Design a protein with these regions (language model features):
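Catalytic machinery of carbohydrate-active enzymes
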Residues: 1-146
Length: 146
């Protein structure tokens, strides 16, 4: 991947990861703050940086100080994303296939206490009324965690 810059919210940054992985060789993931999102503070940076650094396809995560060249992924919201999820929207903005999320893209150390559990995340901000929550809950049963 080339060096990338992102100024989105934490969720935007997380859902940029499959796109970043699809860009190729490891580069630096730079983070900055912009007026159109919740301010990226040092505390918020410290929250997300360990996850970014844990990815084999990212060489490092740093606060942006004007380094070049970078692919600015912050501009994805300036394009129409109607009907797209955050991965596809960001992929479209940088010319990457939106299907990149079909491959494993998040790497974390296993937690033995979670063995056999299925972690589900429902954003407080984005809801899809067409998602089959009832069927999903029945499918995962007591293995599911929110």
């Amino acid at each position: 991947m080339p060096n990338v810059l992102h100024s989105g919210d934490l969720g935007d940054i997380i859902y940029a990861l499959p796109v970043v992985k699809a860009m190729g060789d490891p580069g630096i993931f730079y983070i900055t703050t912009r007026p159109w999102t919740k301010a990226m503070t040092p505390d918020r940076f410290d929250t997300i940086a360990p996850l970014l650094r844990a990815q084999s396809y990212i060489k490092g995560a740093e606060w942006w100080r004007g380094e070049h060249p970078v692919v600015d992924m912050s501009t994805f919201r300036s394009r129409s994303g109607r009907g797209l999820n955050l991965v596809a929207w960001q992929a479209q903005a940088v010319g990457v296939t939106p299907w990149v999320c079909q491959e494993k893209w998040l790497e974390v150390e296993p937690d033995e206490g979670m063995n056999g559990r299925i972690l589900l995340h429902r954003s407080a901000r984005y809801h899809n009324d067409l998602f089959p929550w009832t069927e999903t809950l029945h499918s995962v049963g007591k293995s599911g965690l929110f």
